[in-house]
């Protein structure tokens, strides 16, 4: 299995267990699922809760909540959404830091070139739809953390996450 960590904070962000789709040679998108966590009421197969007197909350959600699978699996956190102009400044600073980190780690020249050439195209795509995104960050809430952008596909039902490909580092486990 391959875990992808934020290149600046070291936070685990995503793994190859998800189907990563490359966009514009710089972004990765992955479809997510809403899962229910909390208030696990474990019942044995074949058990009859009403006969056991355990159907008091039948149909109730209790303390269960719906979250995105990647948020739960990688301990991602909701992050206050910046105004569009603030985000623009923040993302430009983030891209400079990623570029510096790629150079520091002696990434291949073609990787650095790919990042430089495609960053503006990706940023324009993101800014055009920025109002539709929710934002997550890694577990550390680091100041330099990648903003993971969450939106919904055209069907309005399927959530997906967007990551900066060059802002992730691969670790095999």
UniProtKB/Swiss-Prot annotation:
Domain TCTP: start-end pairs: 1-173
Q: Which terms are listed as keywords in the entry?
A: Cytoplasm, Cytoskeleton, Microtubule, Protein biosynthesis
- The principal location of this protein is cytoplasm
Q: Per its UniProt entry, which superkingdom is the organism in? A: Eukaryota
GO MF annotation list: calcium ion binding
Q: Name one Pfam family in it.
A: TCTP
What GO cellular-component annotations does this UniProt entry give? cytoplasm; microtubule
Location comes to: Cytoplasm, Cytoskeleton
Q: Does the keyword Cytoplasm apply?
A: yes
Enumerate the Gene3D superfamilies for this protein: Metal Binding Protein, Guanine Nucleotide Exchange Factor, Chain A
Keyword Protein biosynthesis applies: yes
- GO biological process: any one? translation
Family (UniProt): Belongs to the TCTP family.
Biological role stated in the UniProt entry: Involved in protein synthesis. Involved in microtubule stabilization.
Query: What is the official name of this protein in its record?
Result: Translationally-controlled tumor protein homolog
* Source organism: Aspergillus oryzae (strain ATCC 42149 / RIB 40) (Yellow koji mold)
């Amino acid at each position: 299995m391959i875990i992808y960590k934020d290149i600046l904070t070291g936070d685990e962000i995503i793994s190859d267990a998800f189907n990563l789709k490359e966009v514009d040679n710089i972004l990765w998108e992955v479809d997510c699922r809403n899962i229910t966590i909390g208030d696990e009421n474990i019942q044995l197969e074949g058990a009859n809760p009403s006969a056991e007197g355990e159907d008091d909350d039948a149909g109730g959600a209790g303390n269960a909540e719906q979250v995105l699978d990647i948020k739960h699996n990688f301990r991602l956190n909701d992050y206050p959404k910046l105004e569009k102009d603030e985000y623009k400044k923040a993302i430009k600073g983030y891209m400079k830091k990623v570029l510096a980190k790629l150079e520091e780690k002696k990434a291949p020249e073609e990787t650095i070139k790919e990042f430089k050439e495609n960053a503006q195209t990706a940023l324009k795509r993101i800014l055009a739809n920025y109002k539709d995104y929710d934002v997550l960050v890694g577990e550390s809430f680091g100041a330099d953390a990648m903003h993971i952008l969450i939106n919904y596909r055209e069907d309005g039902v399927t959530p997906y996450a967007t990551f900066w490909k060059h802002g992730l580092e691969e670790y095999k486990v």
